[in-house]
């Protein structure tokens, strides 16, 4: 019997990636997206942790779908900026800004920081909320150094 899970995101790339992983590992799971849920109200990310914001989104998804719901929150934590922008990464240059504007602002803010002191971590947290009330989170971090200009996708 195929199980269903909701991926509580509007990001088509995340949906494609999760579906690819499910096929790769031969799991009998159908992944639904927010487009499959009628009148889904986008929750505000009001927490100060990645875990808290991922849980807000997963809880909202589970409540509106009745299905197990997965959601994530992620961002960049720059040592020289006191680990900011952190949970505010997608809004660092203001609400509704594109990723490039947020990246450019971070780079302007650290332009006087020497190359050897541009440490940063990309943090991603995935939350799963089950209809029976159980909640799970997992966290991944990638540490590195910021360059002087945006590169990659």
Where are these regions (language model features)?
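Anionic-ligand binding patches
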Residues: 2-6, 12-32, 36-153
